[in-house]
Structure formats: C-alpha cells, structure tokens
Amino acid sequence: MARRTRNRSEIIARRFVSRQQPTRTQPFVERWRWIIQGQVQGVGFRASCSRRALDMGLKGWVRNLQDGSVEVQAEGPPIALAELRAWCEKGPLGAQVKRVKPCQMPVRGDDWFEVRY
C-alpha cells in the first residue's frame, strides 16, 4: 500500500510540474507585486501604469494605498514584467519614485489590467 501512495504522489507531482512549465502555445507567466514609494500619487501614475501594462499585454491591477504609495500587481512574460518594473522605477512625468519594493506572487490568471479605486 505504501508503494501505491508513493507512485500516486509522484504522478501528482509530475502533473503539477508539467502545468507550471511553459509550452509552445502558452508562454511562461509570472506574477509580481511592487509597492512604489515616493511622490507617486496625484501625478497620473495609475493611469500611465495601466496604459503601459496593457501595451505590453500584461494582466493585473494598480491602486493607490493610504500611506501615499502605489501598489501594482502584474502577471505575464518575465521580459514584459521587467520592462514594467523599469518603468515603475521612473514613473510618469511629475513622479518622484524613491523606492520600489518587489515581491513575487502566485499566478492568479487575471483577464485584464485595471485601475482599482
């Protein structure tokens, strides 16, 4: 009986790993959360970030936080995510970004990118 359980565990593990690996029809996807600190509210950060993310084909959302920072959660190909993070480090004209705190998150499968209020 222990052998059957081990084989079943191996099968489940292989199925999980195969779902996480990119295929030719489905590119590798990651999800990242960034907290952007500095003078980032009242300068059009959310709208600009949303346009950039949509142009790059990313999914997720952006919102203001009560402490004056902005939170971005985005998922998509790692190259596009790196481009969005680089943009977040500068922000739109008028923003003064002091710090970007990154955190990798589990992929959720969002359907679009939106501004949250």
Curated annotation (Swiss-Prot):
EC number in record: 3.6.1.7
Catalytic residues (positions): 46, 64
Coiled coil: none
Keywords: Hydrolase
GO molecular-function term, one example from the UniProt record: acylphosphatase activity
Domain of life: Bacteria
Catalyzed reactions per annotation: an acyl phosphate + H2O = a carboxylate + phosphate + H(+)
Pfam family, one: Acylphosphatase
Sequence ranges assigned to domain Acylphosphatase-like in this UniProt record: 31-117
Cleavable signal peptide: none
NCBIfam families membership: PRK14452.1 (NF011023)
Similarity comment: family membership: Belongs to the acylphosphatase family.
PANTHER family per record: ACYLPHOSPHATASE (PTHR47268:SF4)
Name of the protein in question: Acylphosphatase
